[in-house]
Amino acid sequence: LFDLFWNPQQQLKKIPLKEGMKVVDYGCGPGRYTLPVAKMVGLKGKVFAVDIQPLAIKAVEEKAARQGLTNVETILVDSYNTDIQDSSIDLVLLIDTLPIIKDYDALFHEIHRLLKPDGLLFVKHGRIKMSRTTEIVENTGLFTIIECRGHDMLVAPKTR
C-alpha cells in the first residue's frame, strides 16, 4: 500500500541521482529505495543501506543478491555512527525516518560528517508536518535548506 502512494521509482525522479554516486539510504528498511538507487548509480556507484533492524539489513542483502546488485553494502548500526569515511558521500536519503529518530543532533551530525561539501541530503517526511521537519533541520545549524516541495526537502551541508 505504501508503494501505491509513494512509488519509489516516481519519488527518485525528484532526486538528483547520477551514475557513479555514493549514496547512503539511512533507515533503509527492507530496501524499497536502496535497490532502485543501486541500479541508478550503476557499478561505478555504491549504496550504503543503513538500519538498526537486523531483519531489514537481511532483507536488503537477500534482495540485492537476488537482483545481482554488487554495489550495495549493508550497515547494521546500534547508534547513529556508520563508520563510513568522512566527506565521501554524494547523497544521503532520509525517507520517512524522522518520526523514529530519538536523537536528531547525533543523526544530523553523522550525516554532515558523511557528506562531501557539495553533497546533498534528501528528506521525505510523510508522517510529520513540513514545519516540524524544517525546524528539526534548521535547529542543527549544519544544513541549508535548498528546496521544500510537498513532503520533500533537499538540503545542503554548511561548510565545515
Identify the function of each model-found stretch:
Residues F2-M21:
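Conserved alpha-helix/loop element of class I SAM-dependent methyltransferases that forms part
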Residues G20-G29:
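Conserved class I S-adenosyl-L-methionine
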Residues G68-S79:
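Conserved SAM-binding strand-loop segment of SAM-dependent methyltransferases
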Residues Y80-V92:
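A short acidic, Gly/Pro-enriched loop at the edge of an enzyme's catalytic core
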Residues D90-D103:
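A short SAM/SAH-binding and catalytic strip from SAM-dependent methyltransferases
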Residues D105-P117:
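A short glycine-rich, Lys/Arg-flanked "PGG" loop and its adjoining helix->strand segment in the class I
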